[in-house]
């Protein structure tokens, strides 16, 4: 999957003007995958991309691992992206061009589908406890009864209208940001090991600028859905959710 993700970056990078070309790609090893990752990097040695490998030494968690790259970045723009994301050819330039021409915007989020072409709703409104638990626990019977709340949370109307709009929260699977803004807010909050670190970062970024949903910036995301990953992930989800609500305010319904 990582090799395919890198290939999509290589293709998309070709659409970017030379003065804004990608300075480097940083691969953070949050496990013990050095041999595999270095082999993948070697496969891309023929391309004019500076791909750097960093070992976290241990599993630091999603946000802390990304902070390694964020703190080292001296580029104008910084893309936070998962290894299970395929970027469409025009997407990087679509996002960078928008950031270039809108000084008040600090981050942009794409439209997304999964591997089966189902829509993924990456931009969201402020969550409620009810909606989060129903989705995390995959409670289908209850989900039908609160569908309007879920649609509002997932900004489904916004996505289906295919218009550029300002949003409050975006997914950490793909966040194209101004690096200065990331440095100003301190990157991801280290108190979140997994889940809600992107919600927290979004809110902090939104305090200093606008976050925009760009329907013409497109990706395929093959991950997501904590309910399918077992009880351990559900427990981590709930623990991070409590931290998030304690800091930013509880919304029950």
Predicted regions and their residues:
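Short, well-formed alpha-helical segments that are part of the catalytic scaffolds
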Residues: 1-17
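A conserved acidic beta->alpha catalytic loop
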Residues: 8, 26-38
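Glycine-rich, basic loop-to-helix element that forms the pyrophosphate-binding segment
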Residues: 55-73
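Short aromatic/hydrophobic "clamp" motif used to bind/position activated sugar donors
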Residues: 78
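Conserved donor NDP-sugar-binding/catalytic core segment of glycosyltransferases
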Residues: 86-122
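Short, flexible, basic/aromatic active-site loop/helix in glycosyltransferases
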Residues: 127-167
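A short, conserved alpha-helix in the catalytic core of glycosyltransferases
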Residues: 159-162, 166-187, 191-218
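Active-site-adjacent helix/loop segment of glycosyltransferases
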Residues: 199-203, 207-253
